[in-house]
From Swiss-Prot:
Keywords: Acyltransferase, Transferase
InterPro entries xref list: CAT-like_dom_sf, Plant_Fungal_Acyltransferase
Active site positions, chain numbering: 159 (proton acceptor), 389 (proton acceptor)
Family: Belongs to the plant acyltransferase family.
EC number(s) reported in the record: 2.3.1.-
Source domain of life: Eukaryota
Expression tissues: Expressed in roots, leaves, stems and seeds.
Transmembrane segment boundaries: none
Protein name: Hydroxycinnamoyltransferase 1
Gene transcribed to yield this protein: HCT1
Taxonomy of the source species: Eukaryota, Viridiplantae, Streptophyta, Embryophyta, Tracheophyta
SUPFAM superfamilies registered for this protein in UniProt: CoA-dependent acyltransferases
Single Gene Ontology MF annotation: acyltransferase activity, transferring groups other than amino-acyl groups
Function per UniProt: Hydroxycinnamoyl transferase that catalyzes the transfer of an acyl from p-coumaryol-CoA to various acyl acceptors. Can use feruloyl-CoA and caffeoyl-CoA as acyl donors.
Length: 442
């Protein structure tokens, strides 16, 4: 599929913005150091309105983007380091990259169920990380126009700047301005609210920051990894309907006194079980599940509405594969227990624990974290991922524009609000073949 760039612009804030260095909290620094990829798809429909050339008009989008960058001014900055080498944001107003491109031979339908493959990643501008961290835009955007009249919006957002909730706050505010309405909630830009206590006093062991379990073997995994190339991976997306989810829940005990499980805990237990079975994990194999949780409402008092930054804490259920695969209730119980632990006391302790670590970069999760026998499952179900209406209608799909690591998965809500949930996941290719069958056994 050929994609040709029509125009590439560095969009700066429409008005003068504060020239400051923004301190990053520990939560801003234990995230992957690349741009989080996501892609929106929009179909040309009767609700689009306007002249054909007006659909996703680049000039209109650029003007609104420049306006949005005024209150969200850190997004227009660059990464920098303070005198101690700690990464911070230099709010210098240098701008964000906005690309307009054409895919004259492709249509939205060519992307099928929108699995986050390399084809999807091509809809997002590539970022060159070889130079200094101050060299690249913190936000890269690409509007791609297809032959069918539809478009995609590819977004790459540097993770130090924002988590999913804050990133969507920006994108949705930009779309509001483009549509002609005002920003509903202004961003709150002060990350010192997430400073550790003085002195730091962690009160939990914080297993979420301990190394992930390795495969049980007579040969250390690191030894075998050096002698063999990593096995090929596959990426796919699977849709579970509302009735599928109901059948899953029916497998759990009910009635008075029965444990209560969130929808996430039930679905996560099913995915964890299917992945463990597909991988053929022995029953005694420890396996760790990484569940990203938003701390905004868990902290007391809650953070101000519009807090802009990373507030992701991680719940990490840990169990032997035999327990995970024995039945849905056992896995769901382990997951729910870990989620219920994530209260204000635990989250404040996590901030303190991170403050005492000599090198936060050593705790950044990556391929070594999620690979077999472990799993990361991030839910976007409570995020407003379908609210970016730039004036030409809501997206028909929004999801990850690629999955960086084997063993990482995302739960996505349906754009048409039919109660279905989709799981986008990356696994070793041979494991994916088995997972495709297992995931629908509900």
């Amino acid at each position: 599929m050929a994609i040709t760039v029509r125009r590439s612009t560095m969009v700066r804030p429409a008005w003068e913005t504060p020239r400051v260095r923004l301190w990053n909290s520990n939560l801003d620094l234990v995230v992957p150091r690349f741009h989080t990829p996501s892609v929106y798809f929009y179909r040309r429909g009767p609700e689009g309105g306007g002249a054909p050339e007006g659909f996703f008009d680049g000039e209109r989008m650029r003007r609104a983007l420049a306006e949005a960058l005024v209150p969200f001014y850190p997004m227009a900055g660059r990464l920098a380091r303070d005198e101690d080498g700690r990464v911070e944001i230099d709010c210098n107003g240098e701008g964000v990259l906005f690309v307009e491109a054409d895919a004259p031979d492709a249509s939205v339908d060519d992307y099928g169920d929108f699995a986050p493959t390399m084809e999807l990643k091509r809809l997002i501008p590539a970022v060159d990380y070889t130079d200094d961290i101050s060299s690249f835009s913190l936000l890269v955007l690409q509007v791609t126009y297809f032959k069918c009249g539809g478009v995609s919006l590819g977004v790459g957002m540097q993770h130090h700047v924002a988590d999913g909730m804050s990133g969507l706050h920006f994108i949705n505010s930009w779309s509001d301005l483009c549509r002609g309405t005002q920003i509903a909630i202004m961003p709150f830009i002060d990350r010192t609210l997430l400073r550790a206590r003085d002195p730091p006093t962690p009160s939990y062991p914080h297993v979420e920051y301990q190394p992930a379990p390795a495969m049980l073997s007579s040969v250390p995994q690191s030894v075998t990894a050096n002698k063999t190339t990593p096995p090929p991976t596959a990426v796919d997306i699977f849709k579970l309907t509302r009735s599928d989810l109901g059948r899953l829940r029916s497998q759990l005990p009910s009635g008075e006194g029965a444990p209560r499980f969130s929808t996430y805990a039930v679905l996560a237990a099913h995915v964890w079980r299917c992945v463990s079975l597909a991988r053929g994990l022995p029953s005694e194999q420890p396996t760790k599940l990484y569940c990203a949780t938003d701390g905004r409402q868990r902290l007391q008092p809650p953070l101000p509405e519009g807090y802009f930054g990373n507030v992701i804490f991680t719940a990490t259920p840990l169990a032997e594969a035999g327990k995970v695969t024995s039945g849905l209730a056992d896995g769901a119980a382990v997951i729910q227990e870990a989620l219920d632990r994530m209260n204000d006391s635990y989250c404040r302790s996590a901030l303190d624990y991170l403050e005492l670590q000599p090198d936060l970069s050593a705790l950044v999760r990556g391929a070594h974290t999620f690979r077999c026998p472990n799993l990361g499952l991030t839910s976007w179900v409570r995020l407003p991922i379908h609210d970016a209406d730039f004036g030409w209608g809501r997206p028909v799909f929004m999801g990850p524009g690629g999955i960086a690591y084997e063993g990482l998965a995302f739960v996505l809500p349906s754009a048409n609000k039919d109660g279905s949930l989709s799981i986008a996941i990356s696994l070793q290719a041979e494991h994916m073949e088995k997972f495709r069958k297992l995931i629908f056994e509900v």
